[in-house]
């Protein structure tokens, strides 16, 4: 579906924005410019065929996809060849930018929409990202499979669901001692207040909540860390759709 000639990648302005935003995050993105440019080209190529993302403009993609994804690196959680799950990856965010900048990570990108998974597979191939794979499926099903349950050191999700729902979807994937990061917008306090008892039921606890501003745009973001402290009881996650309809908190 995504074969063929790629349209042009990032413009000089787009590259400059990416470098400037990376600097604001403490990252030197110059060695990765070509990879991000190719990823942008793939997004543009696919946008006429598949509804991958509502963001189409170059600056929007650079700031709200690439740089937003890389805010994860403000947390000291990514050292070494960790196995990482990106749940609800969509067009590959935050997983693909994270893998570009931290190639040693072993990354599995999961989405429930087949066309989005096909795009991510194509991006992994074109970018030559070794140790990354895209997977179609629902969290409630995959988290019960032996190769996925309590099999990841880290998990990430960006704007997938409220924290009370997301915690039930993410924590079963984590090994004890692992950590998940929920990427949230400006208002997170109401979601945090009822969360601790639900996390305890799932074998977890609330870790750091890092408030930050998105480079260049100044938009408020929060990175919410969920720590895995004990095995998740076999009852979780519940059947597909149940966590959304009947959240634990």
Swiss-Prot record:
GO terms for molecular function: rRNA (guanine-N7-)-methyltransferase activity. S-adenosyl-L-methionine binds at residues 88, 93, 111-113, 139-140, 158. It is found in: Cytoplasm. It catalyses: guanosine(527) in 16S rRNA + S-adenosyl-L-methionine = N(7)-methylguanosine(527) in 16S rRNA + S-adenosyl-L-homocysteine. GO terms for cellular component: cytosol. Its main location: cytoplasm. Its EC number is 2.1.1.170. Keywords: Cytoplasm, Disulfide bond, Methyltransferase, rRNA processing, S-adenosyl-L-methionine, Transferase. InterPro entries: rRNA_ssu_MeTfrase_G (IPR003682), SAM-dependent_MTases_sf (IPR029063). Disruption phenotype: Low-level streptomycin resistance. Disulfide bonds join 164-249. It is an enzyme of class 2 (transferase). It comes from the Bacteria. Residues 245-246 are annotated as: RNA binding. The keyword Lyase does not apply. Pfam families: GidB. Specifically methylates the N7 position of guanine in position 527 of 16S rRNA. Shows a marked preference for deproteinized 16S rRNA as substrate and is completely inactive with native 30S subunits as substrate. Belongs to the methyltransferase superfamily. RNA methyltransferase RsmG family. HAMAP family: 16SrRNA_methyltr_G (MF_00074). This is Ribosomal RNA small subunit methyltransferase G. It comes from Thermus thermophilus (strain ATCC 27634 / DSM 579 / HB8).
């Amino acid at each position: 579906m995504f074969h063929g000639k790629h349209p042009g990648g990032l413009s000089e302005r787009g590259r400059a924005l990416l470098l400037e935003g990376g600097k604001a995050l403490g990252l030197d993105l110059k060695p990765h410019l070509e990879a991000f440019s190719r990823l942008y080209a793939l997004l543009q190529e696919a946008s006429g065929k598949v509804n991958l993302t509502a963001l189409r403009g170059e600056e929007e993609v650079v700031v709200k996809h690439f740089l937003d994804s890389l805010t994860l690196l403000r947390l000291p959680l990514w050292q070494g060849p960790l196995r990482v799950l990106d749940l609800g990856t969509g067009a590959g965010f935050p997983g693909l930018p994270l893998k570009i900048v931290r190639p040693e990570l072993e990354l599995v990108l999961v989405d429930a929409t087949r066309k989005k998974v096909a795009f991510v597979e194509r991006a992994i191939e074109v970018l030559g990202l070794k140790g990354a794979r895209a997977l179609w499926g629902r969290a409630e099903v995959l988290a019960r499979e032996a190769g996925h349950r309590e099999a990841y050191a880290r998990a990430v999700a960006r704007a997938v669901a409220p924290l009370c729902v997301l915690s039930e979807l993410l924590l079963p994937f984590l090994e004890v001692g692992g950590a998940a990061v929920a990427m949230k917008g400006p208002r997170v306090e109401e979601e945090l207040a009822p969360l601790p008892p639900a996390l305890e039921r799932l074998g977890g606890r609330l870790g750091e909540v890092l408030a930050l501003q998105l480079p260049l745009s100044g938009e408020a973001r929060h990175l919410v860390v969920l720590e895995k402290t004990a095995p998740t009881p076999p009852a979780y996650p519940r059947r597909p759709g149940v966590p959304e309809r009947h959240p634990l908190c």
